[in-house]
Amino acid sequence: KFLVFIMMFFLFLNIFLLFINRWIYNNFGNVKIQEILFTLLSPTSGTDTSLIYSFILKALIPALFIVVISFCFLLFLHKRLNGKILKLLKITCSIFVVSTLLLNVFYTNSRYDIINYLNYKNQKTTIYNKKKAKTKKLSEYIGDSSIIYQNPQDIQITSESSNNLIYIYLESIENSFMDTENGGIKDVNCLPELTQLAKENISFSNTDKLGGAFPFTGTTWTIASMTAQLTGLPLKVDVANDMDQQDAFMPGAKTLSDFLHEQGYIQELMIGSQKEFAGTDKLFLQHGYDRIYDYDTLKEMYSYHGNNINKWGFNDCQLFEFAKEELTKLGSTQNKFNFTLATIDCHTPDGFTCSNCPNTYKNQYENIYACQSKQVSNFIKWCQEQDWYTNTTIVLVGDHPTMAQSYIKDIPSTYQRTTYNCFINSKIETTQIKNRQFTHMDMYPTTLAAMGFKIYGNKLGLGTNLFSKLPTVIEKYGLDYINEEVQKSSEYLDENIYQFK
């Protein structure tokens, strides 16, 4: 009986792990262990409940069902087979279950890079142990090549005149959905308006066509991407656990929004989902933002059409209308503002359609991408008609490559997937926009430069001002090297930036 119990337990683990791997792949694509751990440890408030139901229906219940059927079948055989044959069958089944479980564990490790994650956790990096740079005049200073990390607390940032900022995180918008002529992989461009905006304004690219930021450790899911763009640092899994225990989100970091708060900017975040999800409220409210308009507050403030709500919250078509009303209020004041918006319609696994979505592409997801492109373009046109536009810089950034795995199967393995970026009405120009290697961490200093700020040394965190002549950290040191180093432990970061207790 004990052997049967152990065998059934291992069988359950085996099948459950198999279904978990399949479920994660279908819903989130090729994620690594950092993303999984952060999601599990983060506050769950605001999570799409359909994901939880999907996990139960497609992973837990099938595994339990197979184990129950197997147990019943074993009982059936137990009554009909003699002792020797039954014993041999049990041993054979046990060997099969244990061996396949081991193979499953090895596969899971290779897929999520678990052993490497644990190995890196036990190693220490020195890329954050910076030395003080010699003081030089801003006009003469081009950066100290021996320093990789620059703590924004120590950096001088000045401006004679700076713009307002509208910063839009575009959910899952990557360049592969453009046509091949413009740097994507599609026969027909799913992002025609965003493509045109990128051509007419400033868009940094990893190729000689349109392109963008490389996916990078600690930046490839929404809250991680937001953190990287605000702090110039990748997000560590430990932050999720710290939020639960200490209610803190990188308290020692000086973010883009912390700096703008010091400059007197009014700062607001508008999202269609709930602000508590993954600690979004803590990241923004603890770092200079005055208020957050989320699903709960927006539905109390404004009237809306009932069809414009999805499983996460408000559809983007409704969110852009809310944004126009709030920007009209902000624009009527004498204060400079930073208005941040985050879209949701292109969220995995299938996106969310609205009444504005076309039906001209080959699948729903491509239609939603096209819809997003059109809506963003219309919103930008509306902004350009407002009195405050001449003093406002608009930044569009895809938060991470899409996780909707079923819609990206046609992407060649040789194609480098990158996220979209576009700087509109920048106060600074550059011709060095093609064949760049950069990550979301570079958005921090680059955004400030686009607004009209001068950054002493052109580096903040691990980010480099792309408008400067300096190479980014991955251009100088290589993507693989920096990718490995940021996964290692750092006492400097833990004590000074994350301030773990």
Model-derived regions: residue spans:
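Solvent-exposed soluble domains appended to multi-pass membrane proteins
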Residues: S146-K501
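Exposed alpha-helical structural elements
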Residues: E35-I36, K84, K137, E193, ...
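Transmembrane and membrane-interface helices of multi-pass
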Residues: K1-K124
